[in-house]
């Protein structure tokens, strides 16, 4: 596979047709994955990355479930996970028995346990962590369901010692879920009551933050509105602490979202795959309650060329390298690593495979879609149109903002 920046990725396979090596070349060679090994069941048993990190996989002989996963790097074992299961292969525990790292180093020992009800729904989870420099943490999670298998409650309690700072941090949340009562809407989430806290002291009700999330949907069941309200300590409710609005097309694809005035727009190809996302801040100035001016910035964008490449404003791009469906490398590049400015192609190739495409018109149409989305959300649009499409300038969105550069 040859990427647009001309790096060539070569995949090597063993006699059984299984991938065993991934090599990249651009000016010099580089082994992203040096070796992959398999057992007679074609399950992965060994993986070595270019940085020398090695992963070993072992499976139980009867049901071939992952039993142990060990990662070694730099002569140290940084992960040594052991897994246990119940009779129907639900995970019961995951224990990382790696050694506690040296002072100042990340990592440590972790243990998680999981409990299920008679219908194999997760009802309880616990976990502990022990790291360097007296770092410890523990959590408990409890889940509740009704007879229609809907989640009705979720509660988590967390305690950390010397993890984010020297001292103890207590945090947690208690979520209560309410669903629609009308026929056809009983699996639509209507409200979530969110009581949470974060304190260095002993938890008490005075530390609680009381939020409520209310949800609205269109006729197709797409989420169109989320309102977050908060009850203050004096008992008075702030009805609109935050809100989110969403716009969908006739094929139930998300076209735009408005998060408290921050508008994001989305485009798709003929197969329904997302190809472009644009976003930016919007500022307005009012004098004596009268609008005096504003600025809308839509320079932030992500261009999803394929699962292997994502381009962003300013000529930055990220390319992804996979082994099968597992992404193993993400590399960030810019104009220098690309070798040229890919936007500097007049009309972006208006003559392709005998087809003539008027990209000026398409560019203007996309700009109008952005304006229409702002109008849908009643968010003022004060952007400065960049109509100079010649020599690719229409792609640059250079409005002088830091995002554009």
Regions found by a protein language model. Name each.
Residues 78, 139, 144-192, 233-235, ...:
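Short secondary-structure transition motifs
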Residues 1-13, 21-28, 40, 46-55, ...:
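Beta-turn initiation residues at beta-strand->coil junctions
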Residues 102-106, 132-134, 165-168, 204-206, ...:
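Short consensus segments that form the blades of beta-propeller domains
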Residues 113-117:
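Beta-propeller blade signature
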Residues 64, 72, 83-85, 97, ...:
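Extracellular/periplasmic ectodomains of large secreted or surface enzymes and adhesion receptors
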Residues 8-9, 33-34, 54-56, 80-81, ...:
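Short loop/turn microsegments at loop-to-beta-strand junctions
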């Amino acid at each position: 596979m040859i990427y647009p920046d001309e790096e060539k990725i070569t995949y090597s396979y063993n006699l059984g047709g299984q991938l065993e090596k991934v090599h990249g070349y651009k000016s010099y060679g580089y082994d992203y994955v040096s070796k992959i090994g398999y057992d007679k069941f074609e399950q992965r048993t060994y993986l070595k990355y270019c940085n020398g990190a090695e992963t070993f996989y072992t499976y139980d002989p009867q049901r071939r479930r992952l039993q142990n996963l060990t990662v070694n790097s730099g002569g140290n074992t940084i992960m040594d996970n052991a897994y246990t299961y119940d009779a129907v292969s639900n995970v019961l525990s995951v224990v990382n028995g790696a050694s506690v790292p040296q002072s100042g180093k990340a990592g440590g020992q972790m243990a998680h346990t999981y409990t299920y009800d008679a219908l194999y729904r997760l009802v309880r989870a616990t976990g502990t962590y022990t790291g360097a420099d007296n770092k410890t943490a523990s959590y408990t999670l409890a889940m509740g369901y009704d007879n229609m298998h809907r989640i009705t409650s979720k509660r988590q309690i967390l305690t950390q010692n010397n993890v984010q700072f020297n001292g103890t941090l207590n945090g947690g949340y208690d979520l209560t879920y309410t669903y629609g009562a009308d026929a056809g809407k009983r699996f639509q989430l209507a409200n979530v009551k969110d009581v949470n806290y974060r304190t260095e002291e002993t938890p008490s009700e005075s530390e609680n933050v009381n939020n409520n999330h209310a949800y609205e949907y269109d006729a197709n069941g797409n989420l169109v509105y989320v309102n977050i309200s908060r009850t203050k300590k004096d008992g008075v409710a702030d009805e609109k602490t935050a809100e989110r609005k969403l716009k969908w097309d006739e094929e139930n694809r998300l076209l735009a979202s408005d998060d408290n005035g921050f508008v994001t727009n989305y485009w798709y190809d003929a197969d329904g795959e997302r190809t472009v996302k644009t976003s930016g801040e919007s500022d307005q100035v009012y004098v004596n309650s009268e609008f005096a001016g504003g600025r809308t910035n839509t320079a932030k964008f992500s261009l999803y060329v394929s699962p292997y490449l994502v381009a962003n404003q300013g000529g930055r791009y990220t390319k992804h390298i996979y082994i099968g469906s597992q992404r193993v490398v993400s590399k960030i590049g810019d104009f220098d690593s690309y070798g040229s400015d890919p936007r500097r192609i007049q009309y972006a190739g208006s003559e392709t495979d005998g087809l003539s495409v008027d990209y000026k018109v398409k560019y203007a149409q996309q700009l109008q879609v952005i304006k229409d989305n702002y109008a849908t959300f009643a968010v003022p649009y004060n952007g400065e149109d960049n109509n100079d499409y010649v020599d690719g300038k229409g792609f640059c969105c250079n409005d002088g903002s830091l995002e554009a550069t």
